[in-house]
From Swiss-Prot:
Subcellular location, principal: membrane
Protein's name according to its UniProt entry: Sensor protein VanSB
Domain Histidine kinase: 230-445
Cited SUPFAM superfamilies: ATPase domain of HSP90 chaperone/DNA topoisomerase II/histidine kinase, HAMP domain-like, Homodimeric domain of signal transducing histidine kinase
Record organism: Enterococcus faecalis (strain ATCC 700802 / V583)
Phosphohistidine found at: 233
Amino acid sequence: MERKGIFIKVFSYTIIVLLLLVGVTATLFAQQFVSYFRAMEAQQTVKSYQPLVELIQNSDRLDMQEVAGLFHYNNQSFEFYIEDKEGSVLYATPNADTSNSVRPDFLYVVHRDDNISIVAQSKAGVGLLYQGLTIRGIVMIAIMVVFSLLCAYIFARQMTTPIKALADSANKMANLKEVPPPLERKDELGALAHDMHSMYIRLKETIARLEDEIAREHELEETQRYFFAAASHELKTPIAAVSVLLEGMLENIGDYKDHSKYLRECIKMMDRQGKTISEILELVSLNDGRIVPIAEPLDIGRTVAELLPDFQTLAEANNQRFVTDIPAGQIVLSDPKLIQKALSNVILNAVQNTPQGGEVRIWSEPGAEKYRLSVLNMGVHIDDTALSKLFIPFYRIDQARSRKSGRSGLGLAIVQKTLDAMSLQYALENTSDGVLFWLDLPPTSTL
């Protein structure tokens, strides 16, 4: 069903009210005007016939016609007649209408007693005047009707224009289109438009946040799907290798008859498998937010010094050396266990990727409300496309070499989740001297 516009409705209601008001007003004024006109005409007529009344009162019936004729001769514009109490006409002017067809509104009894009545008729000029005034009244009513139509149109236009603009804006909002801010108004419609636009802005922000959340959820699902697929692959390969070794030993095939040798290989594989599973569980805990950082004062130099002995044997085996430059007294606020875990993985990754005879440099320097701790493995360059993927779980630049050396590919992923849990700034980037990892730590004075 086609909807009627609000303009037509407001205009119709307004014009109906105005026309009713004009009609009632015109009716009241017409009644008042007629009553006033009749009263004035009656008063004037009685006054005009007063000399005749006096003459007739002082005359007998025989002289009445002569007196009346003389009065009419002197006032030829007057039309009247005289009748007795039985209704018989005693005298009538030539143009007087004594029949009952004359409207009572145009008859005036200017005198009445026990014997006679003098009945005067309205003058023709008075009738024409009455007719002219009536026409003028009709014209005035027509003008008032036209004026009412104009006022109704202006009023309806003024009332419906902001409402239609508000409806158009609401339609655009429903379709998520751009809506400009409303014009300033000092009435309720202005307040409504402002509130609707504010609600629209908040709705857009909420939708944007929801879209971001959906995108993050989708990204998280993709990451989890990749993580579980990669984890399954990482766990399946060693298990398959151990199964082959065990079957060979059970069947006493070839070299597999040397059970002690291959059992030790199986134990090594299972140890690496256990380490990988532990790292997977740790990464899952970090990803689920079950590990809550507890910030404590931490000496950077002492923390690094306590970690380096764990990697000294590996570095010496590759003829590598550590160079540290961390001034004493650099105290930061961080979770000791989490920061040690992250630094352990960073240093291990640096040692594993530094060429034989190379150098791993570790230093810190103060900055604006922070201490920057840096780890640089000299003489190394990583392709930029691979550099951005190093924090992805199970990603390895050299798959064969990394698997042979026992690397799980989870070290930097654990570093990323750990530092993100502590809301710390960090980066891994290429420099002219090698690959640099830096980490910003807040000093104790900032918290």
